[in-house]
Each structure stands twice: as structure tokens, then as C-alpha cells.
UniProtKB/Swiss-Prot annotation:
Membrane topology: Peripheral membrane protein
Name of protein: Glycerol-3-phosphate acyltransferase
Short motif (HXXXXD motif): ranges: 305-310
EC number: 2.3.1.15
GO cellular component: plasma membrane
Biological source species: Photorhabdus laumondii subsp. laumondii (strain DSM 15139 / CIP 105565 / TT01)
Description of its domains: The HXXXXD motif is essential for acyltransferase activity and may constitute the binding site for the phosphate moiety of the glycerol-3-phosphate.
Lineage start: Bacteria, Pseudomonadati, Pseudomonadota, Gammaproteobacteria, Enterobacterales
């Protein structure tokens, strides 16, 4: 580089260093994009901009990537390390690639023709200052193609809202070998790069935002809403104008009022907030979502719902991953001042808890959601309908998912893909409130003063986790499950086909399973699992470290799913981090430390344990069977797991099918054997290892309460085979509450209504309850026999004494009196 050019770049870099603070996407490009720093890199930028080049250079130097201002020396040839595809501020879609970029591409391709060992990486990079999509009807916003003056003001105003995004590399060796090295290939390469940047820009910025009143006018003109308004006027005996005004009021209540400036400013505030409240936000698998957005998919984000923080955290993460924040379905309870107006400008649209008896509202909401899809906006909704109070996934509510499929059946929207998302925390600010509600306290209404009280609790929140699960493309899903689904497409009116409801239910289950497939284990939920497994909720430091190591090795060596994230830290490091969170106490004496989970916090910590219970429930079941039988064959153990597994699968949204189960169980047995928790004797007999009995017992305790709940329901069914479903669920809960008092079981989900409902439904599906509602006693007795052998005698005695038939209890009482 000539000396005058160096001076020029240094002078230009001085104000940029002050004004520009770019965020890198992805945050670790070398690892996430698998960049080979030993091979030469040619940086490809969309258009000529020295400011963009220097912003790129700053990030390259920070990431130990080659300096784009240095020339690439290949043999006797020197070529620039960067290339601009376009050369100026003109309308992007109509400008052809400039000859200079084609010339540089051709020079590099020619080098590959003459040097068979050469393999240069093309690294596409885009630099964005601001991401406002603009409003419909306005002139094009200043997104990318800016002249010098426009660029100066963009940097001045948006320099701290800039992004440098790296894409996957392209091998020039592959291009040269597969497509040749002549000038037409260089032209094609430049043209493909231009298309890549155009798609990437749309994925990052999104479609233009609607003018709110024009959107309402379009909705009011739809045939479905016109009919609903007429029906409203007729059934309520009001004027058509009054019914129409009701419809407008409902639209005002529902519709978002998305504002880029609010998103940008809130991003600054939230960034400051997260840095002070959280020790880190861990994001996994975001690249797969960026790829889908760039390929033109309509994205529906379906996260689990742990906290009110979920809304803000996910939008913040998506924005900083180079994606458009979605329109979010939020409960109407959050539409209070000042949160409601702010959420609305951040993309929230509000939904009532029930549509029952309000056809006009249901129609307007369905049409509004369909319009969002038709315009290409990403959407977010919580499948569970509300925040989980137990830390487990709730049964999915399918209303909004049904409307999503209805939008697809209009035939108007782009390909819709659902993104299951696991959101996890080391501290949930509402967890104490959840515990009170599960004990029967009335749910507090959200409002300004409650929000202020909540903000006061925001401190020392540890780590946060946002894991993007395996996407579910709806068209592909329907092609596989309902090949004739296209016959039901109707752009005017939705007619519910026979396959619709069963398919929605199956799809909702798959979404929940995929959420669990991407769970995040962390220091808090692992320590909580171990301490809650101890009878006295206390372990020595050595015992706790041993147990943490057991869990970590299980998750690493016999992973539940490939997307599950397991801490890279050692057990010692995890424990130190957990102790810093002030959730556990340490009792020190001359013999060492004892880690204690105080009784008043135990019920709160079950929430965190339940976040990952599905990851450890099968190894826990295997450990439980081995402990209670002491000696058992693999075949017998597998048989017992197979008979219990359907109940676990339904309750915890587990991923394994019945056919996959034997291989999974064998893998887990091998891992437990490798850890010396159990021993594999001759003839395939499995026995416990006395030297490692404690970690095996703690592992087994993880499923203890779950098996007791199943035994309660089975015992009641055996005692009264004709018991009605409602009475069975009610008496199961009552018996569970009694058992929890008598035996000190301090877990809110132990007598949760939804858990027993799921269990009873599964028993019916698995053939334990007939279509007429009566128990099939041969089956229920067989299952209860298996469960009974896995419980302590005192627990079994309590269950059986309470669930005996009334006449049996009378006889026993008379015998005692006599």
C-alpha cells in the first residue's frame, strides 16, 4: 500500500474509531463459520465504501483475521484482499456489477487455473449502518447505497447501531474446478454475490412497515370481517356503524405499532441492562435461522415461556443476530401503561385469554395474523399460552398455531417455518410468585406498581440461554403427514378439513419436543437436581462435585439430543459459579464444606431442576430399577423401562419413539457401566456397584416423585376400575397432597392438575383405560406391580391404604375396633 494511501486511511479512521462501534455477526466467525486462517481470504463487500472497509478492518484485527488493507501475495502476483461488487449510490437492484470486481474475480480464478494447490476463501461481508425498513408509501429509506454526505450523517447518527456480518465462505478452488476460470464465471460470481446481499438485506431489515390506518382499512374491507361485522350488528341488534366501530376498537386493541427507533433505543437500554444484570447471554444455532430468513422463509418463533423477560430477551437476541425482531403475540394483561405502549412499538400485538363467544374478535385476530404472514413479517407466540409455574413445558395451546396453518391454506404467504426455541435462566425473577400461586394464592394482576416491584428484584441473574431448535418447515411437514393438504387451499374462506385438528395437535407436540431437544444445562439446574435428590437437601462438597461430574458425563457421552447444550466448565467451576449466585448455603467445619439447600428455598429450586428433568429422567429410571432389584438382566430392565416410558414421554415431551428406546437404553447402560455406577456381570446381568452407591442413589432419586405420582393414579384405578376420569384426576391430586405432607415431598408439580390430566390421557391412549372409561385391570395391575417395586415400602403402604375401596376400608376399621 502506498504511503499516501496509508495516511488517507489513518486520517479517515480517526473519526470512525470514535463514532462507529460495530457489532459482529456471528460473534465468533472463525469458530462458527469454520474459517481456515491458514488459507488466503478475499473479503467481498456489496458496494464501494471506505467507511465500510475500515469498519470491517477493525473487526478483522480484533478477531485475528487477515487485514483487508494488506495485499495478497501469491507467487509473483499481488492482488487486493477485498473487492467491492458495486461502485456507487444508485438503486441496488438495477445496477450491474462493475468491471473492476469482475476483473479481480477473474484474476483470482486465473491464479487457481495455474496453481492447482491454491484455494482462496471468498468471505462475503456486509456492513450496515441502521436497519429501518421505512413505512409503506415513503421514499426508500437510506439503508445501504449512500453517497459520501449521506454516509457521513448515517455514521454520525447510527454509527453505534452498525453491524458487520460475515457469511459462509465460498471456495475459489471449487469454483475453478467445477465451473471453470473464464470471464463469464467471474461475471456470474459477481451476480450471485449481488443476489446474496439483496436477500441478506431483506432478512436483516424486513419488509416495509404498514401505515396503521391503511392496514385497518384493508382488514375492514376483507370479506371475512365484513361478514363478521354484519353478523355482529344482527345478533346484538345494533347499527352497522356501531358494529364497524367495535371492529375498529378491537383492531386498535390488537395491532402492533412497530417502530424502528423504539427498537434501536431499547436495544441500547437493554444492552446496558443485560450487561449489569446477567453475566452473559448464551445464544446457540442462530446461523440456521439467518440462513432460513435469507432464503425467504416466513419465520414463526415458538419459544417456551419462563418469564416476562422472554419477550425482551428474544427480540434483543434476534436484533443482535442480524434478524428482524418479530411481531409478538402478548397477553392482554400486559397492555397497561407504560409497558403496553412500549411493547406495542417493539412489535407486540395483544391477544385476549379466550375468544369464546366473540366471533367478531376471533375473525379480526385471525385476519390480522394472516395479514402479518402475507406481508412477510416474522411472528412470535408462546405455545404454552402462559408462563410455566413449574419449570416444565406446559401442554400446548393450539389456537394461534391453527391460525398459522389457516394462513398457509390461503395460499398467499411465503413458505412458513416454525422455529422452536428454548429460553433458560439461572434466575427467574417471578419464581417466588409462581410458588405462591401453585400453593393456591391468587395471581397478581400485572400493572405499573407490580412492574416497579419486579424491577427492584433484578440483580445477580447469572447466565441466560437462548437456544434455537430444529426448524419445522410447515409445507414439508404437511407433505409428509397430509399429502393431499393442497386440496384444502382456499384464498377466500377457510373450510376446516378432517385432517386439520389432528394435524395441529401432532404439530404442537412436535414443537414442544423440539424445544426440549435444545435445552440448556447450567450450574444452577444441575446443582439443584443433585441437592433436591438428597433426603436432607445437603451434600458435602466432594459428594456434590461427584454428582455434578456424573450428570455432565452422562450428558456429554450419552447426549439426549445433538442440540442440547452442556456446560464446558468442570464440576468445580460450576459449583463455584452456583455458590456465587447465593441460592445455596455453605456450612464449614473441620471436616470440610457442606453445601445446603435451605428448606424455604427448596420449593423454588424445583423450578430449575424441572427445566432439565427430561435430560436425566431415563438414566434416573435405569438407576432406580437397578437399585431396587439389585440384580437384573438387560432384557428385564428394558421391559420395565418400556412399560413406564409412554407416561414419561407424554409428561415431559420426550423425543424417543418406542422403536428407538432399546438403543437409547443400551447406550445409557453402557455409560453408567463406564462410570462404574453399575457393573455388567456374566449373562448380561446388571448389578449395582457398592463402591459407587451414593451417586447411583442420587441419580435414581431424580425420578422418585414421578413414579410415586403414577403409582397413585394406578392404585386408584385398581381399587375402583369404573371410576370416572374427573374423579380419578381429583382423587389423585388429593392423595398426592396427602402423600407430600406425610413424607415431606416439597415439589409443586407433585399435585399439579395438568400433570395428572396428562397421565390419565396417556393411560387411555396406551390401553389401560377402555373407550367406555373403565380400567382394564390386567394392564393396570401389571403397570402398578412394576411401579410398586420401585418405591419404598412406607410410600407404597401409604398409597395403598388410602386408595383401598370404601368397603375394604370399612372392613379394616371394623376389624381394628373388634
Amino acid at each position: 500500500m502506498s504511503s499516501w494511501r496509508k495516511i488517507y486511511y489513518k486520517l479517515l479512521n480517526l473519526p470512525l474509531k470514535i463514532l462507529v462501534k460495530s457489532k459482529l455477526i456471528p460473534t465468533d466467525p472463525i469458530t462458527e463459520l469454520r474459517l481456515d486462517t491458514t488459507r488466503p481470504i478475499l473479503y467481498v463487500l456489496p458496494y464501494h465504501s471506505k467507511a465500510d472497509l475500515l469498519a470491517l478492518r477493525q473487526q478483522c484485527l480484533e478477531q485475528d483475521l487477515p487485514d483487508p488493507l494488506n495485499l495478497l501475495e501469491i507467487g509473483d502476483t499481488e492482488l487486493p484482499s477485498y473487492v467491492f461488487i458495486d461502485n456507487g449510490p444508485r438503486v441496488f437492484r438495477y445496477c450491474a456489477p462493475k468491471q473492476e470486481s469482475v476483473k479481480i474475480f477473474h484474476a483470482y480464478l486465473d491464479l487457481h487455473r495455474n496453481n492447482p494447490n491454491l484455494d482462496i476463501q471468498l468471505l462475503p461481508v456486509s456492513v450496515m449502518f441502521g436497519r429501518s425498513p421505512g413505512r409503506e408509501g415513503q421514499n426508500a429509506p437510506h439503508l445501504r447505497l449512500l453517497n459520501g454526505i449521506q454516509k457521513f450523517f448515517a455514521i454520525l447518527w447510527l454509527g453505534r447501531d452498525s453491524f458487520v456480518r460475515f457469511s459462509n465462505t465460498v471456495s475459489l478452488r471449487y469454483m475453478a474446478t467445477e465451473h471453470g476460470t473464464d470471464k463469464t464465471i467471474a461475471h456470474k460470481l459477481a451476480r450471485v454475490a449481488r443476489m446474496h446481499y439483496s436477500r441478506q438485506r431483506l432478512a436483516a431489515v424486513g419488509p416495509r412497515l404498514p401505515v396503521r390506518q391503511e392496514l385497518f382499512n384493508k382488514l375492514l374491507a376483507s370479506k371475512a370481517i365484513e361478514k363478521a361485522v354484519s353478523d355482529e350488528a344482527r345478533t346484538k341488534k345494533i347499527s352497522h356503524e356501531k358494529a364497524r366501530q367495535n371492529a375498529i376498537n378491537m383492531m386498535e386493541e390488537i395491532a402492533a405499532n412497530f417502530s424502528y427507533e423504539t427498537v434501536r433505543l431499547s436495544g441500547r437500554v437493554l444492552g446496558w441492562t443485560w450487561n449489569r444484570l446477567y453475566q452473559g447471554i448464551n445464544v446457540h444455532n442462530a446461523e440456521r435461522i439467518r440462513r432460513l430468513a435469507q432464503d425467504g422463509h416466513e419465520l414463526v418463533y415458538a419459544p417456551c415461556h419462563r418469564s416476562h423477560m422472554d419477550y425482551l430477551l428474544l427480540s434483543y437476541v434476534l436484533y443482535h443476530q442480524g434478524l428482524v425482531p418479530p411481531h409478538i403475540a402478548a397477553g392482554i394483561n400486559l397492555n397497561f401503561w407504560p409497558a403496553g405502549p412500549i411493547f406495542r412499538r417493539l412489535g407486540a400485538f395483544f391477544i385476549r385469554r379466550t375468544f369464546k363467544g366473540n366471533k367478531l374478535y376471533a375473525t379480526i385476530f385471525r385476519e390480522y395474523l394472516g395479514e402479518l404472514f402475507a406481508r412477510g413479517y416474522s411472528v412470535e407466540y408462546f405455545m404454552e399460552g402462559g408462563r410455566s409455574r413449574t419449570g416444565r413445558l406446559l401442554d400446548p395451546k393450539t389456537g394461534t398455531l391453527s391460525m398459522t396453518l389457516q394462513a398457509l391454506l390461503r395460499g398467499e404467504s411465503r413458505p412458513i417455518t416454525i422455529i422452536p426455541i428454548y429460553i433458560g435462566y439461572e434466575h427467574v425473577m417471578e419464581v417466588a410468585t409462581y410458588a405462591k400461586e401453585l400453593r393456591g394464592a391468587t395471581k397478581e394482576k400485572e400493572g405499573f406498581f407490580q412492574m416497579i416491584r419486579g424491577l427492584r428484584k433484578l440483580r445477580n441473574l447469572g447466565q441466560g440461554y437462548v437456544n434455537f431448535g430444529e426448524p419445522i418447515p410447515l409445507i414439508q411437514y404437511l407433505n409428509n403427514h397430509v399429502p393431499s393438504w393442497r386440496d384444502s387451499i382456499d384464498p377466500i374462506e377457510f373450510h376446516r378439513p378432517e385432517w386439520f385438528n389432528p394435524t395441529v395437535n401432532q404439530l404442537s407436540e412436535k414443537i414442544m419436543v423440539n424445544i426440549n431437544n435444545t435445552a440448556a444445562a447450567n450450574a444452577i439446574n444441575l446443582c439443584s437436581t443433585a441437592l433436591l435428590a438428597s433426603r436432607q437437601r445437603a451434600l458435602t462438597r466432594e459428594q456434590l462435585l461427584e454428582q455434578l461430574d456424573c450428570y455432565i458425563q452422562l450428558m456429554r457421552n450419552a447426549p439426549y439430543a445433538t442440540d442440547v447444550t452442556v456446560p464446558k466448565k468442570t464440576a468445580e467451576e460450576l459449583l463455584e459459579h452456583a455458590l456465587q449466585m447465593d441460592k445455596f448455603e455453605v456450612d464449614k467445619d473441620s471436616m470440610g464444606d457442606i453445601i445446603i439447600l435451605p428448606r424455604d428455598r427448596a420449593v423454588l429450586m424445583t423450578y430449575y431442576r424441572n427445566n432439565i428433568q427430561h435430560l436425566l429422567v431415563l438414566p434416573s429410571l435405569i438407576a432406580c430399577i437397578v437399585i431396587h432389584h439389585r440384580r437384573i438382566s438387560r432384557e428385564a430392565l428394558l421391559s420395565q423401562v418400556a412399560i413406564i416410558y409412554p407416561l414419561l414421554k407424554a409428561e415431559l415431551f420426550m423425543r424417543y419413539s418406542k422403536t428407538e428406546l432399546p438403543e437409547v437404553v443400551n447406550t445409557l447402560i453402557n455409560e453408567l457401566t463406564r462410570q462404574c455406577l453399575i457393573c455388567n456381570k456374566e449373562h448380561g446381568m446388571l448389578v449395582l456397584n457398592p463402591a459407587r452407591i451414593r451417586p447411583l442413589q442420587l441419580l435414581a432419586a431424580g425420578i422418585r416423585e414421578t413414579l410415586q405420582r403414577y403409582a397413585i393414579t394406578l392404585s386408584l384405578l385398581n381399587a375402583n376400575p369404573v371410576i370416572s376420569r374427573g374423579v380419578l384426576e381429583k382423587e389423585s391430586r388429593m392423595l398426592a397432597q396427602r402423600l407430600s405432607v406425610l413424607h415431606g415431598i416439597n415439589a409443586p408439580e407433585f399435585f399439579d392438575k395438568a400433570v395428572f390430566t396428562t397421565s390419565v390421557n396417556t393411560l387411555r391412549e396406551e390401553g389401560y383405560i377402555s373407550d367406555s372409561g373403565n380400567a382394564i385391570t390386567a394392564n393396570t395391575q401389571e403397570l402398578y406391580q412394576v411401579l410398586g417395586e420401585l418405591m419404598s415400602p412406607e410410600i407404597r403402604l401409604t398409597i395403598e391404604s388410602v386408595s383401598l375401596p370404601p368397603e375394604h376400608n370399612d372392613t379394616e376399621e371394623s376389624a381394628r375396633e373388634g
